[in-house]
């Protein structure tokens, strides 16, 4: 199975992740991971920190001469802003300074509930870890997951499907063409017809001192039928995907396939009819079974059915606003208006990269559970045997 933990604070020296379970023999490089880190830092509407941080990963263990060796993989992403925070965030008691305590909790953040839970009078102890800066190292972890999936010809593509109520229309393109289209967009959207309108909205919102959210969509193609399980609640793949998506900072809703729209339709207009053509298996398809629609989003009963996985997730507007919101000081109990030094106006494009990463992690985990081995070669043998079985099912 694919297990990982992340550690580190937003203004600490670095973010760290340890990944366990990756088989030996998988090609992996810092350069390939850095491509995804750069994508996360891009997108129209980002704030001042992106000018400070130019994320680069360091692989500290688990990889030798460009290939995994089967032991835990350690990744780290340095925080370049650390030089300005060494004393404020020092683990050493001699640097303690009670005069720099942050006692003004910001609406929409983890500040107040976190301080209440952990008995902190300085909400910096909460905001440093709850920050979306943590997603930098999660994207690095997701890049490792994607390397595994791509080895087995499973590909993912995340993009902005909606921004501030402006909806993009996804063109009928193959996965490679869709990724190429999104790569050309400053907003990581697949619909150039609405990109200008989206950028205009971001500019207007920025001028008003506000922020804007949106919806991201991730498609995974090449996923075989049979990942996940119906036998226990925590093995259902759609449940695991939903949890992973909701773990992303500022995400407030998840849909798989038709999602909430299915509730407004009759059953005959929701469920994907099943067809069979034996010749499809001999022409490159994994199986002779196929669908004309994909309202299920590639998952039925918690199990992949061979169609593309389609996940949508909603991101709320960033709660750090230049337009002050009212709050209360947790020490003095006096009201105040929250202020900010720097913030993104819109991070939805970056969020599409994070969503792509966490979906990759869940799919990689499900794939390893199904076809696991200690080496890539062993997994290949297991997978090849399963594909042969599917063709004749």
Curated annotation (Swiss-Prot):
Keyword NADP: yes
PROSITE patterns: CHORISMATE_SYNTHASE_1, CHORISMATE_SYNTHASE_2, CHORISMATE_SYNTHASE_3
GO cellular component: cytosol
Pathway(s): Metabolic intermediate biosynthesis; chorismate biosynthesis; chorismate from D-erythrose 4-phosphate and phosphoenolpyruvate: step 7/7
Cofactor binding mode and count: Reduced FMN (FMNH(2)).
Cofactor: FMNH2
Record: residues binding NADP(+): 40, 46
SUPFAM superfamilies xref list: Chorismate synthase, AroC
Record's keyword terms, sorted: Amino-acid biosynthesis, Aromatic amino acid biosynthesis, FAD, Flavoprotein, FMN, Lyase, NADP
Swiss-Prot/TrEMBL catalytic activity: 5-O-(1-carboxyvinyl)-3-phosphoshikimate = chorismate + phosphate
InterPro entries: Chorismate_synth, Chorismate_synth_AroC_sf, Chorismate_synthase_CS
GO biological process, one term: chorismate biosynthetic process
Keyword Transmembrane helix found: no
E.C. number: 4.2.3.5
PANTHER family: CHORISMATE SYNTHASE
Complexes and interactors: Homotetramer.
Family: Belongs to the chorismate synthase family.
Descriptive protein name: Chorismate synthase
Organism per entry: Geotalea daltonii (strain DSM 22248 / JCM 15807 / FRC-32)
Gene: aroC
């Amino acid at each position: 199975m694919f297990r990982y933990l992340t550690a580190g604070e937003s203004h600490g020296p670095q973010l760290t992740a340890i990944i366990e379970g990756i088989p030996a023999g998988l090609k992996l490089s810092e350069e390939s991971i850095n491509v995804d880190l750069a994508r996360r830092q891009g997108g129209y509407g980002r704030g001042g920190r992106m000018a400070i941080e130019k994320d680069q990963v360091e692989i500290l263990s688990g990889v030798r001469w460009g290939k995994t060796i089967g032991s835990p993989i350690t990744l780290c992403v340095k925080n370049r802003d650390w030089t300005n925070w060494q004393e404020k965030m020092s683990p050493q008691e001699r640097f303690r300074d009670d005069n720099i305590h942050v006692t003004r909790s910001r609406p929409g953040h983890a500040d107040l509930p976190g301080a209440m839970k952990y008995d902190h009078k300085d909400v910096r102890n909460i905001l440093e870890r709850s920050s979306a800066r943590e997603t930098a190292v999660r994207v690095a972890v997701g890049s490792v997951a994607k390397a595994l999936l791509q080895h087995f010809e499973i590909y993912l593509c995340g993009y902005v499907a909606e921004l501030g109520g402006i909806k993009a229309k996804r063109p009928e393109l193959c996965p490679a063409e869709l990724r190429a289209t999104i790569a050309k967009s400053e907003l990581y959207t697949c619909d150039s017809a609405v990109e200008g309108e989206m950028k205009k909205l971001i500019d207007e919102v920025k001028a008003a001192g506000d922020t804007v959210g949106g919806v991201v969509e991730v498609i995974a193609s090449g996923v075989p039928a049979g990942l996940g399980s119906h036998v226990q609640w925590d093995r259902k793949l759609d449940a695991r995907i939903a949890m992973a998506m909701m773990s992303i900072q500022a995400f407030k809703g998840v849909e798989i396939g038709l999602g909430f729209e299915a509730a407004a339709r009759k059953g005959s207009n929701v469920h994907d009819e099943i067809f069979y053509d034996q010749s499809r298996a001999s022409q490159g398809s994994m199986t002779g079974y196929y669908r004309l629609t994909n309202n299920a989003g590639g998952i039925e009963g918690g199990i992949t059915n061979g169609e593309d996985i389609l996940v949508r997730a909603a991101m709320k507007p960033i709660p750090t606003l230049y337009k002050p919101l009212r709050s209360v000081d947790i020490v003095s109990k006096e009201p105040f208006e929250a202020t900010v030094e720097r913030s993104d106006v819109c991070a939805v494009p970056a969020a599409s990269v994070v969503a792509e990463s966490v979906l990759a992690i869940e799919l990689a985990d499900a794939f390893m559970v199904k076809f696991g081995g200690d080496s890539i070669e062993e997994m290949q043998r297991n997978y090849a045997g399963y594909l042969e079985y599917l063709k004749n099912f």
